A protein has these predicted regions:
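Hydrophobic beta-strand positions
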Residues: 150, 219-220
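Short, small/polar residue-rich loop motifs at catalytic or cofactor-binding pockets
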Residues: 142-145, 213-214
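A short beta-strand signature within small-molecule sensing/ligand-binding domains used
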Residues: 199-200, 210-219
Length: 236
C-alpha cells in the first residue's frame, strides 16, 4: 500500500511538473525569473507531502488540460489590455484632461479614516472616468478573470473594478474585500506588476483575501514612457 501510494504521488508530481514545464515554455521570455521557477518545478517530485497544496495551483488530468487553455490565452489578453490602457492615457493627455507630469506624479495624498490606507493622486479622478469601461469589458468577456486593473510603478491602483469599489461601510472586514481601490499593493507580487518591462509576467500567489490566484501583467507605456502595468488576476 505504501509503495502504491508513493507511485501515485510520483505520477501526480510528474503531471504537475509537466504542467509547470508547459507554462514555463509559454513564458520563456520571462528570462531569469522563468528559469528559476522551472528549476524549482523540476524538484517537485520529491515534495509529495505538499501535493495537496500544489494541486490546488496546478490541476491534474482533464482539469489540468482545461486550465492550460486558460493560461495560454492570457498573455495576448493582458498585452492587448495594456496597449489599450496606454492609448486611453495618451488620448487624455492629448485632449488636455491632464498633463504627463500629473500622470507620473507619485506624491499620493492619504485619504483620511481609511484602513488599509487609501490615497488620492493627481490622476485618479481621470482614471475613475476612463478605466472602468476597459476593465469591465475584459471582466465581462472572460469569466475566469477575477480582477483587471491598472497599476503604476509603485503598486498604486487608482481605480479598481466596480465589484471591488463598493461604498465604504466602516466595517474593516467588509471594506477590505469590497473596496480595494486607491490602495498601494506593495506585496512582492503587487510590486512587480507595475515595475517589470517584460512582455508579460505570470505570478501565482495567495491573495491577502486567502484565495490562490494567478496574476499576469504587462507594461503600460504612455508616449514612450513606462507608466506601470496592466494586471489581470484569474483562476485556472
Amino acid at each position: 500500500a505504501i509503495a502504491a501510494a508513493i507511485n501515485t504521488h510520483s505520477r501526480e508530481a510528474d503531471q504537475i511538473v509537466g504542467h509547470v514545464r508547459q507554462i514555463m515554455d509559454m513564458v520563456g521570455r520571462n528570462s531569469a525569473g522563468a528559469k528559476e521557477t522551472l528549476s524549482e518545478a523540476t524538484s517537485l517530485s520529491g515534495l509529495a507531502v505538499n501535493l495537496k497544496e500544489i494541486s490546488r495551483v496546478f490541476k491534474l488530468g482533464a482539469a489540468g488540460e482545461l486550465a492550460m487553455t486558460v493560461h495560454k490565452k492570457m498573455p495576448d489578453i493582458v498585452r492587448d489590455g495594456a496597449r489599450q490602457m496606454g492609448m486611453l492615457l495618451e488620448q487624455a493627455i492629448a485632449g488636455g484632461q491632464l498633463s504627463e507630469a500629473d500622470l507620473f506624479d507619485d506624491a499620493y495624498r492619504p485619504i483620511p479614516n481609511t484602513r488599509p490606507q487609501k490615497y488620492s493622486s493627481r490622476f485618479d479622478s481621470l482614471t475613475d472616468r476612463i478605466f472602468p469601461v476597459l476593465q469591465g469589458r475584459l471582466l465581462d468577456s472572460n469569466p475566469e478573470v477575477v480582477y483587471a486593473i491598472g497599476t503604476d510603478q509603485n503598486g498604486y491602483v487608482p481605480t479598481h473594478n466596480k465589484r471591488f469599489s463598493q461604498p465604504l461601510t466602516g466595517d474593516y472586514d467588509k471594506d477590505f474585500v469590497g473596496n480595494r481601490s486607491k490602495r498601494v499593493f506593495d506585496d512582492p507580487v503587487g510590486k512587480q506588476c507595475g515595475k517589470h518591462e517584460m512582455p508579460f509576467l505570470i505570478q501565482t500567489y495567495r491573495r491577502d483575501t486567502g484565495e490562490i490566484m494567478h496574476d499576469i501583467s504587462a507594461p503600460v507605456y504612455v508616449n514612450g514612457r513606462h507608466w506601470g502595468g496592466f494586471r489581470i488576476g484569474y483562476r485556472a
